């Protein structure tokens, strides 16, 4: 008898027939009917109408039939909740069955029925099953707690199931332990703050013991859980590593990868001088290589992970190049990943072999693979200097094949080689030029144009070549247009006499006929440069380019560290943090590697999932970027610039002002003619505010406030806090504080480049805020910020920007831009930077005002534990522009009457009560009166900060 | 964890659909069909993300198995589970085909219910599963039987049941190796490795404790540190064997092997499952005996003719015989005719496979044979050059190309009265070609 016949019945009146069969007296017929129902369900037919009839078959001693009915129930209970209640009795009865298999089946199925009313009935049987004498029932019940938690988390907590589940971690049966660990780990993920798993040395020891005894799947659950633990010192880390390493020889690749994850993570804590560290490194390589003999799908997962491991610890696999050679019949996804790793492992020692392989691959069939192979040759040239010459000649050989996409890809990488080794391989340009006509991809065209522009002086017909591209200027992609514009300007600067027409043509094409703002802006900048100061133009356009870095496609280090914590999981396959592809709050707990310790004795108990940011002050990072982005786009960039920029001089925004003024003076000069060319300034020009990096640099000295002023006097300056962690800003870390010195406010910034590439083109912008804070000058970063470099910058601020009330009042939203991206963060500024120097009120005025302000505007605060006398407090406050108007002594208490004024003219009056004679009472009482009572809270905070520091 | 599991036929029709998690909707079934099975392009990755839902798939003949999830699951585990599921199904009803799946869909649902609970893989050893998922309805099991089943399914030794009895205690060890080679046209070894498996068939009574020993370099050297007397004796013995110990790059073991013991003492001890299982896998790269050498010579004569000459040389003891030798010489796509001359075996041009296939039934060691062919080409205006795929080879030899030797397999069963000497043991070595390619 075969079951396939159930798939074929598709006649009319089928449901009716089934109904009759289900209610048949004959057991066999009943079972047949249920099978038909399940088959229909599988192929997607709706058989929910049969619900009561199927449920009627539930009371049976035939286990097979019972399982089928349960399967039906799990599928349709949700659509028929009332009917599903009918099944409850059977479930409860089954949970008491003498046969443990039936007890387990009942509790397993009940957990899958997502109907509230049923869940209520589930609690009692579940409680019993969690303490069942049979381990098979207990292990099923453990998973059931996770199911119930998914349906109703509150219920699980109220019923105390979590504690029972925790107890199961000490169960005598390893499989019960493993399932309990799995269930707890999943529940803990949805409650990141709770200390559900409560990992401590004792429980870790239990897990490590269970690890030796449970099934392969259980070992995975336990290892994944262990990876979340943070050992207290390097000794503990080492002892866990020692007990985990045997897992590296398991036949199940997932066990191996999870063990690798634990080791990679805990290795961070071991000192590199330790013998054990070296042993561990050696032990990691063979199992990783063995993963490559698994089935192709697993190879793919392994390769994606190896890619991460090679970036984190290149020393592990540096001698294993050969195993990554591509096999002819590897699936394409395995081939592409292997290629990636080959490039990462390429070094002087193995480059000859690698190149021979890559050349072989470049003749394969799969287009993507061939392209990647060609690109890889270029990357080898850049990475291993000694091989550059051979790479170039290999690429030339490939160009000779005339295979279209090979040629294009080769030209793109040759451009990079030119950038890395300028003036070395120009001899090949002639060959490249021969293939000009076959280039139809934007990237290849742009690369070729760049080469022509860069080496214009050595290519006799450079102008002809570029002119030929210019004909179809508007049909080109932006990439090509931009490149063409730059190349022609370069050409003009190198051979001014012959190419005037060409350059005029491209400038007008870019500025007048294009609606792409980037292109237009670049056009205007070139135009203006050429028309005002060709010498400067030459310096800017033909400036020496920074060498391109060797590794351009490395994963950003903070992300890499996070991904190492996710080895083996989907995150490591996608190379994205879980938050990028998991919905909702689940699994988005940020993980990071443990800090390296040198046998520290710190008794702190680390959290299960430590956060990467240092504890303590952390700025509020704006949660929803969307809103802010919209807001920032509406920023007032000063008055709209109309007419030629010559007219814009008195503007608020520093950036615009500078650029305008700078150009103004530049344009006043006589143009030093090149062959008497007369440039007409472009008719209309909307100069973007923040693009002026090269232009404004001459004026930067003026605003260089960092040195010199220092902390002479002035108001209290808080220590710098991290405002924008590197995690959130692709490697740029910003910390800073606010200062006020002799009347001027500034924002002291410290920019640190924690990425691998050089950062340039910094600019800063504030969102509208309560007190109109705005940068008074552009952000001046002189040199490009190279990796691991830190610069200190003082950014002068003005308070004449546009005003919008923020919540909280002193919230400041900031956008920082560099060549990589735009980043947003928000920070709170202390209010005392806004206290002005002329904030002293005279006595009469004070009295009158105090009376005048209604009492409901008065706010009272206490400043605790501040053992200062009146004089000390008064002088401390005065340095921050809080002025004492009068002083009285009432009943042994010193009363200070003080005034201060904010930059926007709001007066705040204060009464400070000090009890100097009473050492037991060191609290100060502060009453504030102000017409704008919302500032009081922040003024109080300012008082507190000033007095306590 | 795994949110659901689907099985499709080659047309994308659902054969089995089991959803474990609430976040997986019915549309997930269709999403995979539309985006992967019916996709026009070749599959570019075994993991696909469609609208924040991740699909893992494997294919067995023309059946697609897909696991689906919305969480950050352990990806390696999901694939291991899918393979395991294929093994379990194969153990129950043989080949995984559309017909077999349709015929056994009730069984498959029952299995899926047992081996995957809320998406967590559970015990999936066929030995254990077969004791209680029988498709026989409920058997009138006694209380003892029931608790035996549950303790086995959840227990430390989940892969073996108690109370097994054989009249004759017997075991078979197969050392199966596949030797992989990539050679340049000039005869330079670009990469070579052996991946081997030790497969054991055990028919032993009770709960036997086994210890397996082989000529692992690390073990031999460790023992060599014993008394000088012993060392010299061993040296003598090894010299008579010819090949000494071998260096194993890495090995992995069936879950019955005590890994911590292997880690500390490098001894392989275990209680085996009943019947056939894979005891270990290993990989070696040093001192591999390459059973054959392929020497290709390809000459392009003008634009329409290709001359190919291939010599193969066998490189092992003359007393041994290699079998099932097959050399596959790729031909260009525009081949119009082929003339082949070979001294030994049979050679044929197979147009459908774009290759000349040369088969030799048997060949002794230290021999040489050659084939020459003339390939006529149609003139084409295809600019792209022929990629010249490598010449591949298949064969089977009765020795282990890695040099691995089984030294002993000791059996202890303290409770029953049979000793190691009473067990009949068989050892067999088979070396097969893996990917054995020579570029031309």
Swiss-Prot record, chain A:
It is found in: Golgi apparatus; Cytoplasmic vesicle, Clathrin-coated vesicle membrane. InterPro entries: AP_beta, AP_complex_bsu_1_2_4, ARM-like, ARM-type_fold, Armadillo, B-adaptin_app_sub_C, Clathrin/coatomer_adapt-like_N, Clathrin_a/b/g-adaptin_app_Ig. Residues 594-611 have a biased composition (Low complexity). GO terms for cellular component: AP-1 adaptor complex; cytoplasmic vesicle membrane; cytosol; early endosome; Golgi apparatus; Golgi membrane; intracellular membrane-bounded organelle; lysosomal membrane. Widely expressed. It holds the Pfam family Alpha_adaptinC2. SMART domains: Alpha_adaptinC2, ARM, B2-adapt-app_C. GO terms for biological process: basolateral protein secretion; determination of left/right symmetry; heart development; intracellular protein transport; kidney development; melanosome assembly; platelet dense granule organization; vesicle-mediated transport. It is a peripheral membrane protein. Keywords: Acetylation, Cytoplasmic vesicle, Deafness, Disease variant, Golgi apparatus, Ichthyosis, Membrane, Nitration, Protein transport, Transport. It is linked to Keratitis-ichthyosis-deafness syndrome, autosomal recessive: An autosomal recessive form of keratitis-ichthyosis-deafness syndrome, a disease characterized by the association of hyperkeratotic skin lesions with vascularizing keratitis and profound sensorineural hearing loss. KIDAR patients manifest ichthyosis, failure to thrive and developmental delay in childhood, thrombocytopenia, photophobia, and progressive hearing loss. Low plasma copper and ceruloplasmin levels have been reported in some patients. Adaptor protein complex 1 (AP-1) is a heterotetramer composed of two large adaptins (gamma-type subunit AP1G1 and beta-type subunit AP1B1), a medium adaptin (mu-type subunit AP1M1 or AP1M2) and a small adaptin (sigma-type subunit AP1S1 or AP1S2 or AP1S3). This is AP-1 complex subunit beta-1. It comes from Homo sapiens (Human).
């Amino acid at each position: 008898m075969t079951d396939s016949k159930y798939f074929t019945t598709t006649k009319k009146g089928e449901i009716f027939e089934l109904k009759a069969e289900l209610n048949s007296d004959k057991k066999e017929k009943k079972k047949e009917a249920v099978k038909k129902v399940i088959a229909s369900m599988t192929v997607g037919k709706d058989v929910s109408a049969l619900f009561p009839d199927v449920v009627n078959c539930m009371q049976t001693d035939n286990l097979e039939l019972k399982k089928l009915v349960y399967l039906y129930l799990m599928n349709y209970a949700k659509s028929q909740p009332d009917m599903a209640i009918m099944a409850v009795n059977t479930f409860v009865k089954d949970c008491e069955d003498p046969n443990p298999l039936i007890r387990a089946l009942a509790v397993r199925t009940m957990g899958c029925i997502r109907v509230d009313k049923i869940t209520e009935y589930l609690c009692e049987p579940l409680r019993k099953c969690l303490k069942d004498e049979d381990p098979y029932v207990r292990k099923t019940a453990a998973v059931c707690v996770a199911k119930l938690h998914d349906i109703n988390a509150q219920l699980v907590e109220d019923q105390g199931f979590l504690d029972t589940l925790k107890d199961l971690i000490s169960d005598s049966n390893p499989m019960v332990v493993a399932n309990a660990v799995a269930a707890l780990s999943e529940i803990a993920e949805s409650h990141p703050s709770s200390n559900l798993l409560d990992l401590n040395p004792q429980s870790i020891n239990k897990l490590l013991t269970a690890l030796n005894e449970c099934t392969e799947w259980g070992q995975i659950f336990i290892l994944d859980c262990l990876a979340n633990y943070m050992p207290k010192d390097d000794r503990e880390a080492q002892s866990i590593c020692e007990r985990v390493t045997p897992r590296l020889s398991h036949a199940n690749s997932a066990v191996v990868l999870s063990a690798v994850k634990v080791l990679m993570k805990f290795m961070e804590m071991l000192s590199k001088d330790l013998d054990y560290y070296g042993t561990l490194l050696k032990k990691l390589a063979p199992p990783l290589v063995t993963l490559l003999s698994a089935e192709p799908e697993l190879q793919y997962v392994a390769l994606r992970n190896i890619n991460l491991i090679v970036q984190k610890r290149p020393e592990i696999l540096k001698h294993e190049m050969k195993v990554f050679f591509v096999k002819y019949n590897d699936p394409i996804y395995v081939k592409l990943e292997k290629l990636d790793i080959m490039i990462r492992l390429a070094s002087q020692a193995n480059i000859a072999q690698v190149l021979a392989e890559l050349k072989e691959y470049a003749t394969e069939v799969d287009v993507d693979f061939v392209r990647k192979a060609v690109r890889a040759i270029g990357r080898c040239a850049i990475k291993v200097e000694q091989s550059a010459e051979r790479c170039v000649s290999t690429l030339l050989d490939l160009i000779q094949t005339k295979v279209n996409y090979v040629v294009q890809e080769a030209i793109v990488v040759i451009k990079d080689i030119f950038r890395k080794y300028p003036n070395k391989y120009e001899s090949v340009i002639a060959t490249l030029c021969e293939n000009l006509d076959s280039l139809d991809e934007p990237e290849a065209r742009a690369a070729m144009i760049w080469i022509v522009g860069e080496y214009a002086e050595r290519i006799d017909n450079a102008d002809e070549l570029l002119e030929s591209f210019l004909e179809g200027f508007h049909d080109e992609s932006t990439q090509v247009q931009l490149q063409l514009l730059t190349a022609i300007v370069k050409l003009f600067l190198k051979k001014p006499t012959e190419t005037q027409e060409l350059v005029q043509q491209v400038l007008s094409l870019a500025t007048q006929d294009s609606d792409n703002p980037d292109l237009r802006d670049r056009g205007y900048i070139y135009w203006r440069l050429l028309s005002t100061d060709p010498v400067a133009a030459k310096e800017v356009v033909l400036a020496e380019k920074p060498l391109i870095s060797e590794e351009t496609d490395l994963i950003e280090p903070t992300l890499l560290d996070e991904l190492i914590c996710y080895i083996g999981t989907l995150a490591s396959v996608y190379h994205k943090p879980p938050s990028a592809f998991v919905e909702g709050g689940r699994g988005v707990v940020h993980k990071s590697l443990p800090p390296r310790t040198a046998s520290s004795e710190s008794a702190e108990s680390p959290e299960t999932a430590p956060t990467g940011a240092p504890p303590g002050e952390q700025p509020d990072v704006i949660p929803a970027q969307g809103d802010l982005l919209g807001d920032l786009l509406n920023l007032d960039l000063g008055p709209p610039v109309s007419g030629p920029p010559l007219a814009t001089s008195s503007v608020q925004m520093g950036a615009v002002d500078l650029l305008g003024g700078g150009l103004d003076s530049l344009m006043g000069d006589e143009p030093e003619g090149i062959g008497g060319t007369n440039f007409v300034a472009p008719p209309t020009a909307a100069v973007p505010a923040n693009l002026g990096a090269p232009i404004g640099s001459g004026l930067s000295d003026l605003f260089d406030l960092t040195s010199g002023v220092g902390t002479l006097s002035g108001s209290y300056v808080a220590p710098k806090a991290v405002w924008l962690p590197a995690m959130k800003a692709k490697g740029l870390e910003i910390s800073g504080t606010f200062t006020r010195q002799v009347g001027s406010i500034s924002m002291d910034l410290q920019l640190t480049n924690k990425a691998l590439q050089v950062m340039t083109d910094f600019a800063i912008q504030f969102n509208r805020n309560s007190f109109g804070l705005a940068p008074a000058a552009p952000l001046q970063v002189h040199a490009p910020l190279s990796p691991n470099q830190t610069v200190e910058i003082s950014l002068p601020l003005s308070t004449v920007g546009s005003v919008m009330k923020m919540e909280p009042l002193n919230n400041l939203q900031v956008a920082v831009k560099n060549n990589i991206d735009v980043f947003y963060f928000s920070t709170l500024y202390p209010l005392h930077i806004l206290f002005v120097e002329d904030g002293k009120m005279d006595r009469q005025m004070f009295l009158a005002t105090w009376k005048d302000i209604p009492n409901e505007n008065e706010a009272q605060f206490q400043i605790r534990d501040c053992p200062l006398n009146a004089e000390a407090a008064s002088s401390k406050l005065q340095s921050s522009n809080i002025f004492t108007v009068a002083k009285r002594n009432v009943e042994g208490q010193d009363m200070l009457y003080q005034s201060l004024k904010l930059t926007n003219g709001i007066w705040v009056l204060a009464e400070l009560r000090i009890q100097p004679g009473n050492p037991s009472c060191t609290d100060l009482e502060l009453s504030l009166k102000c017409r704008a009572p919302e500032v009081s809270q922040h003024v109080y905070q300012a008082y507190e900060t000033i007095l306590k520091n | 964890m795994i949110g659901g599991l689907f099985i499709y036929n080659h047309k994308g029709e659902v054969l089995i659909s089991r959803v474990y998690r609430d976040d997986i909707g019915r549309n997930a079934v269709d999403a995979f069909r539309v985006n992967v099975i019916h996709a026009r392009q070749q599959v570019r990755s075994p993991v696909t993300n469609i609208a924040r839902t991740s699909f893992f798939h494997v294919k067995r003949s023309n059946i697609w198995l897909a696991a689906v999830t919305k969480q950050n699951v352990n990806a390696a585990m999901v694939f291991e589970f899918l393979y395991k599921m294929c093994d379990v199904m194969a153990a129950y009803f043989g080949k995984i085909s559309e017909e077999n799946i349709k015929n056994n869909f009730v069984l498959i649902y029952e299995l899926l219910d047992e081996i995957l609970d809320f998406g967590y893989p559970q015990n999936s050893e066929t030995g254990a599963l077969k004791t209680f998922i029988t498709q026989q309805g409920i058997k009138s099991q006694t209380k003892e039987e029931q608790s035996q089943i549950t303790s086995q399914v959840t227990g430390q030794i989940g892969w073996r049941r108690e109370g097994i009895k054989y009249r004759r205690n017997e075991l078979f060890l197969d050392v199966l190796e596949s030797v992989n080679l990539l050679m340049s046209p000039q005869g330079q070894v670009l990469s070579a490795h052996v991946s081997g498996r030790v497969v054991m068939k055990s028919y032993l009574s009770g709960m036997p404790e086994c210890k397996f020993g082989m000529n692992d370099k690390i073990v031999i050297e460790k023992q060599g540190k014993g008394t000088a007397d012993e060392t010299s004796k061993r040296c003598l013995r090894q010299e008579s064997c010819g090949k000494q110990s071998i260096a194993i790059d890495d090995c992995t073991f069936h879950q019955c092997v005590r890994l911590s013991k292997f880690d500390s003492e490098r001894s392989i001890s275990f209680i085996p499952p009943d019947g056939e299982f894979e005891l270990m896998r290993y990989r070696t790269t040093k001192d591999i005996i390459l059973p054959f050498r392929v020497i290709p010579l390809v000459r392009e004569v003008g634009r329409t003719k290709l001359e190919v000459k291939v010599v193969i040389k066998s490189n092992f003891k003359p007393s041994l015989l290699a079998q099932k030798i097959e050399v596959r010489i790729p031909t260009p796509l525009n081949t119009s005719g082929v003339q082949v001359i070979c001294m030994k075996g049979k050679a044929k041009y197979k147009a459908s496979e774009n290759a000349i296939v040369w088969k030799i039934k048997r060949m002794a060691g230290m021999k040489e044979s050659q084939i020459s062919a003339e390939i006529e080409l149609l003139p084409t205006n295809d600019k792209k050059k022929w990629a010249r795929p490598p010449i591949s080879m298949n064969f089977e030899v009765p020795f282990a190309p890695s040099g691995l030797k089984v030294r002993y397999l000791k059996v202890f069963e303290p409770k029953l009265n049979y000793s190691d000497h009473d067990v009949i043991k068989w050892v067999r070595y088979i070396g097969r070609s893996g990917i054995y390619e020579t570029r031309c």
